[in-house]
From Swiss-Prot:
Protein source organism: Parabacteroides distasonis (strain ATCC 8503 / DSM 20701 / CIP 104284 / JCM 5825 / NCTC 11152)
Protein name listed in UniProt: Biotin synthase
Residues where [4Fe-4S] cluster binds: 62, 66, 69
InterPro entries: Aldolase_TIM (IPR013785), BATS_dom (IPR010722), Biotin_synth/BioAB (IPR002684), Biotin_synthase (IPR024177), Elp3/MiaA/NifB-like_rSAM (IPR006638), rSAM (IPR007197)
Its EC number(s): 2.8.1.6
Length: 327
């Protein structure tokens, strides 16, 4: 299948296989691949650009051993350690972000899951946010139980985030304290309750292009419409501290393939993009990135909101209040 044939097939509503995607990844004409992804982005998603922000509401001392993560208690890193933030601080940040035109605000906590006592504080915080702002609330709190997810949903959280992080076949190489099956159980339960799902991963953790394609196809089959894509930023003290940063062309090829495989999804700039040159960031936006977490991130440098808005609009996007994945 040529790049042109793949593009036309997708534009007509077809899907490409993992084998076809891998063949396209190896095609020497990268610019043609990038342009095909751009046309698919515009055809299915228009020029809408979706923004969200997060707050690291509980940091460090995590029981899990994810090899990339600064917050794992298994490794000695320079991450700040603190318990669950008080409601007042979270509410302040939510209101502040909404005033900057950001659509959604996520509370993110370290750990395998929050305790029931912590969840009581979190749901109270969410209700306070909803009383003081019209910002939409999201949460990323690990492998919550069904009853915990239900309480979170009832408090006003609409979207639940749980990354699969990498290809299902590769996950066990990166984490031994929980499984991809546990992640998927959480995601399926959250969806059954009524949450919209945000799920993606980290690129550049030693996985092959074939495994990235596996992840992209897995997310497509799961019907995920918000896919955060992080670029690994090696954290000193973690097992991945000496991992070589991904070549920018390989990152761009990955974005193009995620777009071809997930034509209807918001592909979201997330952690690590500050490592990319401005040229590559702009090219990522041209190819298929059409959403972003903006502001401060969890344990890496985030972005300045106004500078990001200029960047996104200069690449032809319109910052929108309404995004299809929220319907």
């Amino acid at each position: 299948m040529t790049i042109e044939e793949a593009k036309q097939h997708i534009l007509e509503g077809g899907k490409i296989t993992e084998e076809q995607a891998l063949s396209l990844a190896n095609h020497p004409d990268k610019e043609a691949l990038y342009e095909a992804a751009h046309q698919i982005t515009r055809h299915f998603m228009g020029n809408k650009f979706d923004t969200c922000s997060i707050i690291n509401a509980k940091s460090g001392n995590c029981s899990e051993d994810c090899k990339w993560c600064a917050q794992s208690g298994h490794y000695k890193t320079l991450v700040n350690l603190y318990p669950l933030l008080p409601a007042k601080e979270c509410v302040y940040h939510a209101v502040y972000n909404r005033k900057q035109g950001i659509r959604r605000f996520a509370l993110v906590t370290s750990g395998k899951r929050v305790s029931d006592k912590e969840l009581e504080q979190i749901t109270d915080t969410i209700r306070q946010i909803k009383r003081q702002s019209d910002i939409k609330c999201c949460a990323s709190m690990g492998l919550l139980t069904r009853s915990q997810l239900q309480s979170l949903y009832d408090s006003g959280v609409e979207n639940y985030h749980c990354n699969i992080e990498t290809a299902p076949s590769y996950f066990r190489q990166l984490c031994s304290t929980h499984t991809i099956e546990q992640k998927m159980e959480t995601i399926h339960t959250a969806r059954e309750i009524g949450f919209r799902i945000c799920c993606g991963g980290i690129i550049g953790m030693g996985e092959t292009m074939k495994e990235r394609i596996e992840m992209a196809c897995f997310l497509q089959k799961e019907g995920v419409l918000s896919i955060p894509l992080n670029l690994l930023q090696p954290i000193p003290g973690t097992p991945m501290e000496n991992t070589q940063i991904l070549e920018e062309e390989e990152w761009l090829t990955t974005i193009a393939l995620f777009r071809l495989i997930n034509p209807n999804a918001f592909l979201r700039f997330s952690g690590g993009r500050a490592q990319l040159s401005e040229v590559t960031q702009r090219k990522s936006l041209h190819i298929g990135i059409n959403s972003a977490i903006i502001g401060d991130l969890l344990t890496t440098i985030g972005s300045k909101v106004e500078e990001d808005k200029v960047l996104f609009t200069s690449e032809g996007y319109s910052l929108t209040e309404n995004t299809d994945w929220e319907k």
